[in-house]
Curated annotation (Swiss-Prot):
Lumenal side: 82-502
Entry GO CC: endoplasmic reticulum; endoplasmic reticulum membrane
Lineage summary: Eukaryota, Metazoa, Chordata, Craniata, Vertebrata
Name of the molecule in the record: Transmembrane prolyl 4-hydroxylase
Complexes and interactors: Homodimer.
Gene source species: Homo sapiens
Annotated Fe cation binding sites: H328, D330, E374
Length: 502
């Protein structure tokens, strides 16, 4: 079993409990189960998706979009899209509109979600016919689990071999081709941007306020030192105190900032992530072991086959010595201004923002790492979450090269072990709600040897209707396209620009 090193006060680890296969089943009603006291014992291993407890700040999202350089569309077109897509609930669409409509939108049932019970809780499940597996709860915030021996050593070696045969490319997060146009159409004033960054409302931008919101630029990990170097290069901080007043910020030309970021050539150690990756298809026509692993994930999650099978292909990642991935979340918040990468085929292309919508992450460790390479969850099981608290004095908990040992929970890589967690909070109606801030995680610095992992991301659109339309369209392509238009082709197109949100 992979060791999980924990710092800070954590719930007491319970003794291992063997039980029959858990009752994974869709929930009926959150309030009814709460009244009955379910979710506190062995008889209720599955809970319905309930009211979200956290909020992903819209202000943070807006600032993040500025500095991650995502494409910004025309606001008027956006409003028209939202109006005509969702309609006006207070008005009658009229008989002609109803007659010409496509009919009732397809709907999907509630999503299942494994109950954590308590940290250290174990349960026995049978995912394959010849052996049992044990699921251990590692944290409740985020809801995080570990399964030793999910993959055999032979399966791990096969995945690595297939990835090497296909070829790996350098992993990086870079600006989109529409970056210059995005900046020219930005409708946010300098004053509004200053107010969004000024978290403590003191009229000055401290370094940690800027760092908390501008996590990367051109794939370059921002540090206090790099921020001050940038200030000096673009003459944004005349007095050199590292603090920007409103006047100093107003005098700064944001185009100079982006020119500087674009021209900076960062070393590997300065990047947001330092790794190589490739994608392996798991559907019809793939290696039988790859298909078997996807079926095992399907049995583990108890989600519908359509959701699991139409999710992203398996991502295989190699971290060499010195490799790392600074702390991030796997999913981005979804507002009316955004679409999910996987359902954009059925969404209106005029929506300006695109993000990854990953309901679950299932991560496999494919080898034993000689030194370092842990997966860190910096704020796991914290009582509260505050973006600004991630940076205190000279410690940035998101920095996995320097401060992995400060994180609340670290999982040591062990060949064949899987860890999985939920990236979204429940919405109270059986679907996904806000992004779970506690799912913040990263890959610690590999100090010796090489680290191999694989990610199975389970994609769900927060819009239940859009997810249903996506599944319907993929089914139509499979029926009508024959061998030339199978879901593999559709998925390759849908995930051509797949990214991890920071």
């Amino acid at each position: 079993m992979a060791a999980a090193a924990v710092t800070g006060q954590r719930p007491e680890t319970a003794a291992a409990e063997e039980a029959s296969r858990p009752q994974w089943a869709p929930p009926d009603h959150c309030q009814a189960q709460a009244a009955a006291g379910l979710g506190d014992g062995e008889d209720a291993p599955v809970r319905p998706l309930c009211k979200p407890r956290g909020i992903c700040s819209r202000a943070y999202f807006l600032v993040l979009m500025v500095f991650v350089h995502l494409y910004l569309g025309n606001v008027l077109a956006l409003l028209l899209f939202v109006h005509y897509s969702n309609g006006d609930e207070s008005s009658d669409p009229g008989p002609q509109h109803r007659a010409q409509g496509p009919g009732p939108e397809p709907t999907l049932g509630p999503l299942t979600r494994l109950e954590g019970i308590k940290v250290g809780h174990e349960r026995k499940v049978q995912l394959v016919t010849d052996r049992d597996h044990f699921i251990r709860t590692l944290s409740l915030k985020p809801l995080l689990f570990e399964i030793p021996g999910f993959l055999t050593d032979e399966e791990c070696r096969l995945i690595i071999h297939l990835a090497q045969m296909k070829g790996l490319q350098r992993s990086q997060i870079l600006p989109t081709e529409e970056y210059e146009e995005a900046m020219s159409t930005m409708q946010v004033s300098q004053l509004d941007l200053f107010r969004l960054l000024d978290q403590n409302r003191d009229g000055h931008l401290q370094l940690r306020e800027v760092l908390a919101q501008t996590r990367l630029g051109n794939g370059w990990w921002m540090t206090p030192e790099s921020i001050q170097e940038m200030y000096a290069a673009i003459k944004a901080d005349p007095d050199g105190d590292g603090v920007l007043s409103l006047q100093e910020f107003s005098n700064m030309d944001l185009r100079d900032f982006h020119k500087y970021m674009r021209s900076h050539k960062a070393e590997s150690s300065e990047l947001v992530r330092n790794s190589h990756h490739t994608w392996l298809y798991q559907g019809e026509g793939a290696h039988h072991i790859m298909r078997a692993i996807r079926q095992r994930v399907l049995r583990l999650t108890r989600l519908s086959p359509e959701i699991v099978e139409l999710s992203e292909p398996l991502q295989v990642v190699r971290y060499g010595e010195g490799g790392h991935y600074h702390a991030h979340v796997d999913s981005g918040p979804v507002y009316p201004e955004t679409i999910c990468s996987h359902t954009k085929l059925v969404a209106n292309e005029s929506v300006p923002f695109e993000t990854s919508c990953r309901y679950m992450t299932v991560l496999f460790y494919l080898n034993n790492v000689t030194g370092g390479g842990e997966t860190v969850f910096p704020v796991a099981d914290n009582r509260t979450y505050d973006e600004m608290s991630l940076i205190q004095d000279d410690v940035d908990l998101r920095d996995t090269r320097r401060h992995c040992d400060k994180g609340n929970l670290r999982v040591k890589p062990q060949q064949g072990t899987a860890v999985f967690w939920y990236n979204y909070l429940p919405d109270g109606q059986g679907w996904v709600g806000d992004v779970d801030d506690y799912s913040l995680h990263g890959g610690c610095l590999v100090t010796r040897g090489t680290k191999w992992i694989a990610n199975n991301w389970i994609n769900v659109d927060p819009s239940r209707a859009r997810q249903a339309l996506f599944q319907q369209e993929m089914a139509r392509l499979a029926r009508e396209g024959g061998t030339d238009s199978q879901p593999e082709w559709a998925l390759d197109r849908a995930y051509r620009d797949a990214r991890v949100e920071l």
